[in-house]
Amino acid sequence: MAVPKRKMSRSNTRHRRSQWKAAVPTLVACERCHEPKLQHIACPACGTYNKRQVLEV
């Protein structure tokens, strides 16, 4: 197993950790009602996915 040769400073540790963050989810407009929705997920406003009604809203 690899072992660090030198102690890593707080500054370097925090600088490295600052790059590790969650990405903002991509929103697209629904083709039917034009409400913002997540990609590859049924629209929560009108219940359609891929031009088909899949949820009863």
From Swiss-Prot:
Keyword Methyltransferase on entry: no
Transmembrane regions: none
Keywords carried by this UniProt record: Ribonucleoprotein, Ribosomal protein
SUPFAM superfamilies: Zn-binding ribosomal proteins
GO biological process terms held by the UniProt record: translation
Ribonucleoprotein recorded as keyword: yes
Any one GO cellular component localisation term in the record: large ribosomal subunit
GO molecular function, one term: structural constituent of ribosome
InterPro entries: Ribosomal_bL32 (IPR002677), Ribosomal_bL32_bact (IPR044957), Ribosomal_zn-bd (IPR011332)
PANTHER family per the UniProt record, alphabetical: 50S RIBOSOMAL PROTEIN L32, LARGE RIBOSOMAL SUBUNIT PROTEIN BL32
Assigned protein family: Belongs to the bacterial ribosomal protein bL32 family.
Protein name: Large ribosomal subunit protein bL32A
Source organism: Streptomyces coelicolor (strain ATCC BAA-471 / A3(2) / M145)
Lineage: Bacteria, Bacillati, Actinomycetota, Actinomycetes, Kitasatosporales
